[in-house]
């Protein structure tokens, strides 16, 4: 496993047949310049015909929760018999398509007493279908498939939670 900044990833020219940027991480590149750099770096590491899988949130769905309201995201039991509560709120800058999120982690012990609270500021871009297709084309990729979920369901803009892109390297840049 390699941990590096994907914008400047240098794994050798044409070394791989498959690349994946998991967990919607690509959307954390909020600047178009950074998105282009990342796609070019991935492109460079793939062989001709190599595939790149890039899951993104569906902006039509994801933007609905970027309204500033505090939302519970989940409660999870801990190994010690306690509880982890994850919540957060987010706002969308409609002019840039960037969401600012403040994620809260509350740790409770087995007696339900609050032991710790952590805050994680996050930023991510909501990249629409045509915008990502244009970025991919500019980096030398063609879409092979676009799924609406991780079960490879059909992408329906009005209802699919995700855009799971499968791209193929078609040309050298």
Task: Name each region found by the language model.
Residues 1-11:
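Conserved SAM-binding strand-loop segment of SAM-dependent methyltransferases
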Residues 53-131:
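SAM-dependent methyltransferase
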């Amino acid at each position: 496993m390699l941990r590096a900044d994907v914008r400047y990833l240098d794994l050798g020219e044409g070394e791989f047949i498959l690349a994946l940027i998991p967990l919607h991480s690509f959307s954390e590149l909020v600047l178009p310049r950074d998105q282009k750099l990342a796609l070019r770096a991935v492109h460079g590491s793939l062989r001709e015909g190599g595939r790149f899988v890039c899951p993104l949130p569906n902006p039509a769905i994801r933007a609905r929760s970027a309204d500033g309201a505090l939302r519970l995201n989940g409660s999870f039991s801990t190994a010690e018999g306690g509880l982890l509560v994850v919540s957060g709120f987010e706002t969308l800058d409609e002019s840039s398509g960037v969401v600012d999120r403040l994620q809260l982690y509350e740790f409770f012990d087995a007696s339900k007493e609050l032991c710790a609270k952590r805050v994680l500021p996050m930023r991510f871009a909501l990249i629409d279908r045509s915008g990502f297709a244009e970025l991919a084309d500019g980096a030398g990729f063609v879409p092979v498939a676009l799924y609406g979920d991780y079960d490879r369901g059909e992408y329906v803009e009005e209802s699919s939670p995700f855009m799971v892109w499968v791209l193929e390297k078609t040309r050298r840049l």
